[in-house]
Amino acid sequence: MIISAASDYRAAAEARLPPFLFHYIDGGAYAEHTLRRNVSDLADIALRQRVLRNMSDLSLSTELFGETLAMPVALAPVGLTGMYARRGEVQAARAAAARGIPFTLSTVSVCPIEEVAPAIDRPMWFQLYVLKDRGFMRNALERAKTAGVTTLVFTVDMPTPGARYRDAHSGMSGPNASLRRMLQAMTHPRWAWDVGLLGKPHDLGNISTYRGSPTGLQDYIGWLAANFDPSISWKDLEWIREFWTGPMVIKGILDPEDARDAVRFGADGIVVSNHGGRQLDGVLSSARALPAIADAVKGELKILADSGIRSGLDVVRMLALGADAVLLGRAFVYALAAGGQAGVENLLTLIEREMRVAMILTGTHSVAEISGDALSRVTREAAVVP
């Protein structure tokens, strides 16, 4: 298969993965309206082409939370990444480090912090959920500090799991799920050998280390379902700050009032995100929500955005709408499933190349220059861009 754009990796991943895994990463909540709008709304953002601007001094690098990034992109936290490629979190982290950007390890990763951090030569980020088991949260924060994690990404849009109907049809959940997954693995021998056999153990490393016993897929589902905490409030940020003094980013912001509260409670950054359309179907796409949030808090903290980003052009669109940087989630997992570390490195090369083209043709010399001026007048008026 020829890979000429990030979108090609989705088809390659679908061919390689058992359906329960492909649809787990590909699907969203309920009827998946928000999932689709994340992509379509971003694609509708029209840029303002400029010419004869002398673009010989173009630069994609940026500063974020005391780090220099080769481009304004980080890999998002994605649970179960180690099921998409052999020791997948390690491969993805190495790819990010090779391209000079951060990798964010999920709370529910297959590979534990202690396996991933030593595998790369730059600090990584760590994502944490608010869970009823505060002992686990303290343990995770202590281990993250010991491993040299620099930035904490605190996910706040999962006080309860979203209703993901596609999972019941694919075999990730629902009747006879274990049997269906086993049969699917048998019909995908390359994945079964490379990941299913050689990629063991398939524990949730960060949780298993704390609990002192292996945590398989069914344990993962049950443990998370029992530990999501609907009592989560802004006061939990104060509790986190007792244990974490480094940069803290609040992930899951869609409303300007919540963004202002994040500033008030001392967050260093936010991620404008609807969890990739995997939580509440029917909410705004990130691209639609971003301009009002940027208008409310731009300059008071760093604004990141995710959900729907599939190209370097999309990165430039998000920056023009008000983001300082973006997180890539599904896009890198597709590439990881299709080609491992090399696939993710190639994806990031494609993203960088597409960003360069978009910046040259919009006349923006640096990441700092990308603003609402890079958007067409029609888009600016429709999006109410600050």
Swiss-Prot record:
The active site is at H275. Its EC number is 1.1.-.-. The keyword Membrane applies. Pfam families: FMN_dh. Keywords: Cell inner membrane, Cell membrane, Flavoprotein, FMN, Membrane, Oxidoreductase. It is a peripheral membrane protein. Residues 1-380 form the FMN hydroxy acid dehydrogenase domain. It is found in: Cell inner membrane. It catalyses: (S)-lactate + A = pyruvate + AH2. Its main location: membrane. FMN binds at residues 106, 127, 155, 251, 306-330. One of its GO terms (cellular component) is plasma membrane. Its cofactor is FMN. GO terms for biological process: aerobic respiration; lactate metabolic process. Substrate binds at Y24, Y129, R164, R278. It comes from the Bacteria. One of its GO terms (molecular function) is FMN binding. Belongs to the FMN-dependent alpha-hydroxy acid dehydrogenase family. Catalyzes the conversion of L-lactate to pyruvate. Is coupled to the respiratory chain. This is L-lactate dehydrogenase. It comes from Xanthomonas campestris pv. campestris (strain ATCC 33913 / DSM 3586 / NCPPB 528 / LMG 568 / P 25).
